Each structure stands twice: as structure tokens, then as C-alpha cells.
Amino acid sequence: MYNLEQTGIEKDELLQAVLNARAYKPLYVKLKVFYGCNLKCEMCNHWRETREPPVSPERFKAVIAELAELGTKKIHISGGEPMLRPQIPELIDFATAHGIKVTMTTNGTLIDKTRARQLVEAGLRGVNISIDSPIRRMHEKIRGVKGSFKSTTKAVSLFERYRHKGKLSVRINTVVSRTNYQTLETLPDLAHELGADGINLIPVDDHCGEILSMRRRDIKLFNEEIAPKIAERAKTLGLIVSDDEAYPFGQTEEQVRLGRAGRYAFGYYDSHPCYAPWTHSLIDFNGNVYVCCMTRERMPPLGNIVDRSFKEIWEGANYRGIRLKMHPPALAACRRCDDFIDRNRKIWETIGPY
């Protein structure tokens, strides 16, 4: 998410904001700039649905300038597939000029030499590229398009080639599901071969249905035979820091029980707050604003940047209402989230208990 030591968090100011449910700073903001996608991933609905047109680049620029004034340190661009919008290098350049670090998630299939160079020269600081198996046929079965493995792996190599033009980190995202988990043992070797800096193993969402969801016996097999090999190899290659990163469904019996139910916070929020409503926001392709991806379309939007300034929404009654429900979180979606736990722990250690 963001490096706590580099955010310039004012301890007392944040504590008072938390205690009074006031706005702090949107330190980290996700921009979902496009809904559609050029792949047909079996665990995703973006390619199955047609939505309204996205917010214009000019409006996104105005919001980025506003975010800079409010103290945003990092913007993460995603979709759908963000590279279906030709203005992405322009948006990255604009945000970088306003002192904001920019990262992006992409499937990589639309990245060629020119686009890779443009993105790095525009100031892109991090890119997560989706690879769902080191085995070509499995990756393309999941992604639904033949030839996608070659173009995606090439994108990783291209970013590695041009990274000297900026300060770019390259990571591989892998959704672990019933379909692919038995093929992932050599994922660290592929990542290293392509020049990636790290891997992120992401547990499949339970909304993907029984065909993809991991049964208890699947998790047991993964944890006993595959995850240990991934952990050992990935740590040796410098792709992960701790063994925990190789166990997206948890390691202990209790964690596995909760993970099987999709509760990837593993009970943390039963007794601790989530600080995302004070430090984070998500702006959807259509301008709707949510606290995070877990609340996106699971609850009404907090506002829309098409007809209101982001500042009005950030400091408004709807955001305040969410902040009042965070001690501990009363939202069911929070129990299913593992995105913020590490940072929430660090913030809790900094300003709590209270």
C-alpha cells in the first residue's frame, strides 16, 4: 500500500482525526480508470459486462491535482485493463509532476516497446502484472485468450529492460484458485527469469463460485506440498520477505478455516480498527467514490467526482459515517480483506491503544 515511514503521518493529528471521525489525508488512492478488458478471465466479470463511459482524462487530472493538495502520496491505477485508455502515460506524467508516486496493475498484453518506455519515462514507479501460472496452457485457460502468456511475459521483460530510465519495481500478481494451484511451484523461477522484483499470491474470491474456490482439501495440499516450495525458492530469489506471503489462505487450522470462508483478515478486525477511511480512497471508472475495493459496489458510493469535488466527498457526511463504524469495523466486507492489515498494525502501534 504505502510505506508508513515515508508518508509523513503526523501522529497527534491522525489520532485526533480518528477519535473524532474527521478526515485525515487520502495518502493512497486507487483510480479505476476503465471497466472493460481485452482478456476473458474465468474469475472476472469485467469482460462479460458493458458499463457506462468512464470519467474523462481532464476530470481525472483535476482530481489528481486536488489529491495532491490534500496530501496524497501514492496513486494506483487499475481497471479493468487500464492500458485500453491511451491517456495513461499522460495521467502518470501529470500525477508525477504533482509529487505523487504512481503504480499500476495491468495484464501486460497491450505493452510493447514504445508503451513500456513511455510509461517508465512518464514516471511509473511500480507495475503489477498478472500471471496465473508459469505454465502457458494453464495461464491461457484461465485468461481465456490464446497467445496471452507470450505477450504478458514479454511485458515483464520489457519493463525490466527500461527500468533504468526510472525507479520502477515490477511484481507479478497470481490469483490462486482450484484451477491453477497445483501448477505454481515454479512460479518464483519464472518471475526471476523475467526480471521481476517480487510475487503476490492472491486468494481467489469466493464470489467466483465453487468451480474456482479452494476446498479444504485443496488448501491442505497447497499448504503441505506447494506453498513450502514456493516460500523457500521465492525467499532465496528475493521475491518475498516472509513465508507468510506464500500462504494466501493462512497456515494455522484457524486461519485456514477463516480463509476457506473468505475471511482473509483472519479475525484481526474482531478487535482492531481499520484506518482506511482516514488514509485511503477508491475512485471508480464512472466517478463513484468508495473507501476501498472491498466496499466497491457492495454499498452505496460515498459520492461522485463528476458532480462534486473529491474534497467535499472526503470531508463529507458519508465518509464520516463510515469512519464511525471502524472501532472495530462493523462492515462485513472488512472481515474479508487482507489488503490493509500490515499497515493497520503499524498505525495501531503508532497511535494506539486509545
Go through each PLM region and give its residues.
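Conserved alpha-helical substructure of the radical SAM core
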Residues: 2-126, 215-225, 344-347, 354
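Processing junctions and N-termini across compartments
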Residues: 31, 35-38, 268, 328-331
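Amphipathic alpha-helical recognition patches that constitute DNA-binding helices
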Residues: 28, 32, 171, 186, ...
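Flexible mid-to-C-terminal extensions adjoining Fe-S/redox cofactors in radical SAM and related proteins
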Residues: 1-25, 47, 269-271, 275, ...
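Residues that line or immediately flank small-molecule/substrate-binding pockets and catalytic motifs
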Residues: 48, 79, 131, 203, ...
